[in-house]
Structures are given as structure tokens and as C-alpha cells.
Amino acid sequence: MKFYGGLPAILVGTAITSAIVIVQPSVVMALSGEQVNDIAREITVLITGPNSFGSGAIIAKDGKTYYVLTAHHVVSRKDDYKVVTSDKQAYKIDYSKMKRLPGVDLAVVEFTSDKDYKIAKLVNSDQAKQGKEVFVSGWPSLGSVGQDAGGQLIRQFTNGRISGFLEQPLGGYKMIYTNVTRPGMSGGPVLDTAGRVIGIHGMGDTEDPERLRAREGLTPEAARSIAGLIKPGFNYAIPINTFLQLAPQSGVYLALQVENSPAPELGAAYVAGAKPDSRDQIDDINSVLNTADRVVNTIDRIERVRRRFPF
């Protein structure tokens, strides 16, 4: 297979031949860390089901159907999943349409909406170099470190740097970075300094339960439970090029925005606020999830009217 600028030849073309759009601007705007966070906020979704909690990124749209890239382990069990978008609206996922990519921890799920949501720009992940600054966006699950036990969720946006790459990818995971992450952020996007998705987060080092038990005087059960919530070491992402190369094998043909230009230096460093932004906060997740049923009921009523009064 031939490669052009690090992208496999099958991916370089038009929406007619490959259903993938390659955008190669000559100049990439330098953004501040806060501007990258604004982009991350709009493209990051929460994915939740009765037995699972994770994140994802909106990568494409076709009519009223949106496509979300996430880690497969977030949606590995057949269940009733919902997506929560940046405006805190929930939508049901049709699990029968979930696409798993072969040999890696990636999946594409879809939801339907009349609303306009921002679509992520992707970037040739061969541009990722050791030492480059990256950001991770995602929704930590209830009970994660720093989350309110009463049902409040806060989207996390953390900065760090690429520290290296695994010689032998594990489930597709290859990119290593220093960003702090928490359970529930799996499937969330890793962004470069231009706000483009360069990878999908999904694996991280965790605290050793025996060391935690000895240090804190905890019971073995408590130590094991808490250890899973603490990620003191490096974290790992599947590079976006892995998705681009494998998508056709899973029947995933989407109009994607893929750029091939290097990331610029950050215009201004990201500094987290003392308090969470209200746009990144869900006070009552159950109330938000109930909005999915209202959306379905509204769509059903519209379809009944159309069948009765065709126009």
C-alpha cells in the first residue's frame, strides 16, 4: 500500500472514491490552551449504559446521523447505551449499528439528532513527536477521584506531553503521554495544539494496590478498589492513523476531516480554573439521560404526522 504524507493511499481521495476527505491547509492557526479546550468541549461526548461509563469524540455526520469514535471496551457489552452531547442532551445508541475495528480497542457508534454539533478535525498522527504538547478530554465516571458522590459529573481537560511510543502496540495502543486521566475518560479524544484529534485515549497505568495498602493502612479490598481509580503513571492512546487504516475493513466509510500539517506551538498555555466551568458540569445525570426518551417520543410524533399528512 502506498502512503502519502504518512496516510495510506486508500484514504487519500474524495468522498466519491473513498468517502474520506483530506484537508491540507497551508497554515494552521496557533491556538491558546483555552481555545483547544473549547473545541474539546464541543466534540467530546459522554457514553453511558447500565454497566459502562466512558467518553467519545464526534468525528462525522451524515444527514441527521452523527458518528462517535470511542474505545471498544466502553461499549463491548450489548446494552442500552446513551450519548450525552455538549449541550447536555442525551441520545440513544442503536447497538446493532456499532462497528468494531479489527484487532484494536476502537469502535464507532451512532446517534440521530436534528441539532447541529461540532465535528472533530482529525490529523495525521505520524505528526506526533516525542515532547509535543497534547490534551485529553473526557468524562470521569461517578466515584472517580475528584468527583462528587451525589451524582455530579465534571468533564476533565488535562495537558501533558508525548513521552514516547510503544514498539509493539497493545490492542492498538501505542502513543504514551504524561496527562492525568481518570476512569471514564476512556474513548475520549487526545488533541494536538491545533485542537485536532490525534488519538483516542483508553489505557493508563494504575496504582499498585499492595503499595497503597501498606502506605495508607487500608484493607486489601479497599486498596484494590481505590487503586483502580488512581492513575499515577503514563497513559496510552491509539493513534488516529490506526483508525483511518482499519475503518474500511469494518465497513466504516465516513466523510472525515483529516489534516496533514504539523501542529503549531501553543499560543498561550492552558491554565485550569479554580472552579469547574458550568458548561463542563452535569449536576444530575439521571435527569439528563431522561432527555433521550423525550427526543425519541418527539421524533415518533413527527413521523406519525408525516405518515398521516404526507407533504
Residue ranges and their predicted role:
Residues 3-55, 59-60, 292:
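Protease-domain processing segments flanking chymotrypsin-fold serine proteases, especially trypsin-like
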Residues 32-37, 141-142, 201-302, 306:
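C-terminal cap/linker of serine protease catalytic domains
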Residues 42-46, 51-53, 63-147, 171-174, ...:
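Conserved active-site neighborhood of the chymotrypsin/trypsin-like protease fold
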Residues 35, 47-48, 97-99, 152, ...:
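Short Gly/Pro-enriched turn/cap motifs at secondary-structure boundaries
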Residues 309-311:
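Short, solvent-exposed mixed-charge patches
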Residues 32, 118-173, 181-185, 201-214:
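Flexible, gly/ser-rich surface segments that form the specificity/activation loops bordering the active-site cleft
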Residues 56-58, 95-97, 162:
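Conserved hydrophobic positions within beta-strands
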Residues 57-58, 180-204:
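Catalytic nucleophile loop of clan PA
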